[in-house]
Amino acid sequence: MLIGEHLVPELGHENQVGVQCEDAVPTSTNLLILSHEPKYDGLVQLRYSFRLYPTAGQRISLARAFGCARTVFNDALRIRRDAHQAGQPWPKTGELSKQLITEAKRTPERAWLGEVSSVVLQQALRDLDTAYRNFFDSLSGKRKGPIIQEPRFKSRKDHRQTVRFTANARWSLTEGGKLRLPKIGDVPVRWSRVLPSTPSTVTVVKDAAGRYFASFVVETEPGEVMPRATAEVGIDLGLTHFAILSDGTKIRSPRFLRRAGKKLKREQRRLSRKAKGSNNRTKARIKVARAHARVCDARREFHHQLSTKLIRDNQAIAVEDLCAKGLARTRLAKSVYDAGWSAFVNMLEYKAARYGRTFVKIGRFEPTSQVCSQCGVKDGPKPLHVREWECKACGAVLDRDINAAVNVARAAGLAVSACRARVRPGPVPAQCEEAGTHSKASRTSGSQAGIALL
């Protein structure tokens, strides 16, 4: 979810959907914007993440905070599950807070909960409330997408650990640029820009590769509308070429996972040979996680650079609503996941909303590959190995991908043309009723005379 500042410095590093904080590729900064949510008062909520470099003692304190928050979360989940199975009333958050935090600190078994900020423990209960709310909303249909699973117990072996500090925790930023966290200390931060406003919360994240991030939530005014552009573009997403534009431009797929496959296999083999539970296995697991993180970072960098360039150059953008999950059940699964279409489309969507561009997503059942972009005649489905085809109605020779991109734009109502597209109009054959001698003299059209349609 990074975008190189060497390409588009004024737009910054933005991403809407990812929740996993990743480090940058070597040539980039460490800033990410993970989400933006418009509010009713006109403010926009942004999330900025920066890399943290805690000391050895601070890593121990953070591990203690992760463990305490995990314990409170699991205890609350267990109480609610037991109450549900026994047919008892639903335990409220206030009751759980009193029982699992306030009273538990006074017992010898849970006295160590007092070693961390109480705000961290309170936020663990709120996280459980959010998980249950999302679960019930997915069952009732209020939440879009597939039904999500019921909240599960957290494990100390989970690859991703988080704790959140709100304003009540009285965390702050020091004059030296460090992040001061209660009962943890001043943690060094690698800053890449100044925050646009005072953050309301900060979440400390430890990922599978052992890296630490500070994720700040700020509220600010919507981004400035970019200068109006004249171009409009339709995009057809693919595998050999990641994106094909309606103007004929083809952008090859970098295939980051395929390129890193040899190193990933080597690290996976080394991991499989380590004894379970040993320190060497832990080290090998971290190496595998770091290799995967580099692939994710490179892919995210590519998505950000391309999406920002498209937003800057075009006033309106149209894409097809692809079913990535359906394609992932085919032999193309690895390539589909390597492309990361959904993340790229989400970047286009939120950047268009933020910078005053028009974004249109057409239905996935639109026959973009079956309709001739020159005459509009539907020619029927074609196998994937057919990359060029000739329209039987007008004789135009069409590039499959560019033709689909033009149809995507037209289905979205955009006025685009296939500039530089491989379209070779041919003579239209005369119909049966036109093949004989006309009994009456009349003006002959270009199509009737076999003249190429332009």
How would you name each of these model-derived features?
Residues L2-L454:
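Nucleic-acid substrate recognition interfaces
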